């Protein structure tokens, strides 16, 4: 299957750095993911649908490697044999992950995700069918009462979309987001995104999520949001939420509502903390778990409740 160069105005802004070949793919409305496996294989996906092959516009693997390095450099990071993996955000809502050809894989791999609904609020998400009026009222009550929440779900289920929409309900508050790659992107004048930094070629200069959470606490936040908790930053965040920093939110990868506790326990072990102790800390800090999933090709809030 091939795309025409332009069907209508795309759902997102396409940065010049992407180049004409990649831009022609991303210009097609509805595209959410483009996956490039060397110069011969290109796949695309439209809003929570299935992956479909696309005739590759690229000619050599060297072209893919240069494209990957240019994309990563445009996001302020570097990609080379010493650092063969990198993740950046470029333009308005485009996230790029690149893996340079190495012993891990013989070809350069590029994964691009486009956030089509970057500025949706809770009301707009409700109209798409992601949740109903009852859930809408509950989500707004959580925010109004400054309760802490954790949004869990699988990759592509809409965790960041929902987190962004919830935070957008608080335009007058100073919100500090801690992220690996800037994706939340609120338009509020009091929104700040702190992003991690990879180490340089000498192994120095790395800035982790855990470090950024600690720094955010010193910046007089009204709310703290963590783009994705998966390590020591979870403990730092819940300790902050347990000591007066209310109204915070974060996302977590999990396959079901019931598996959230085991995921958190596993993170505890990574932090050299017994799983039950980590769960006790989280239960004291997090008031609500919001689980999102994909049903029939559409994103849905499937359950809202206390940590199981």
Go through each PLM region and give its residues:
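Active-site phosphate-binding and catalytic loops of NTP-dependent enzymes
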Residues: 20-24, 71-87, 173, 271-276
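Walker A (P-loop) phosphate-binding loop of P-loop NTPases
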Residues: 156
């Amino acid at each position: 299957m091939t795309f025409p160069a332009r069907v209508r105005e795309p759902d997102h802004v396409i940065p010049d750095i992407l180049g004409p070949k990649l831009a022609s793919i991303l210009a097609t409305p509805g595209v959410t993911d483009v996956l490039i496996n060397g110069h011969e294989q290109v796949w695309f996906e439209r809003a929570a649908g299935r992956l479909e092959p696309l005739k590759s516009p690229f000619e050599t693997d060297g072209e893919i490697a240069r494209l990957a390095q240019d994309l990563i450099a445009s996001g302020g990071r570097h990609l080379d044999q010493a650092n063969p993996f990198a993740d950046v955000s470029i333009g308005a809502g485009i996230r790029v992950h690149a893996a340079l050809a190495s012993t891990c894989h013989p070809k350069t791999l590029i994964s691009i995700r486009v956030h089509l609904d970057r500025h949706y609020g809770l009301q707009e998400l409700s109209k798409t069918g992601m949740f109903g009026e009852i859930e809408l009222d509950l989500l707004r009550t959580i925010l109004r009462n400054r309760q802490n929440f954790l949004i869990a779900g699988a990759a592509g289920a809409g965790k960041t979309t929902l987190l962004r929409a919830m935070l957008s309900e608080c335009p007058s508050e100073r919100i500090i987001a801690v992220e690996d790659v800037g994706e939340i992107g609120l338009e509020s004048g009091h929104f700040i995104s702190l992003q991690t930094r990879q180490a340089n070629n000498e192994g120095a200069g790395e800035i982790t999520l855990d470090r950024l959470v600690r720094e955010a606490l010193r910046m007089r936040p009204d709310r703290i949001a963590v783009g994705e908790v998966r390590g020591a930053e979870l403990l730092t965040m819940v300790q902050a939420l347990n000591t007066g920093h209310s109204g915070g939110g974060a996302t977590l990868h999990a396959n079901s509502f019931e598996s959230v506790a085991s995921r958190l326990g596993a993170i505890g072990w990574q932090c050299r903390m017994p799983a039950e102790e980590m769960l006790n800390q989280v239960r004291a800090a997090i008031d609500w778990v919001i689980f999102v999933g994909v049903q029939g090709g559409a994103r849905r809030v499937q359950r809202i409740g206390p940590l199981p």
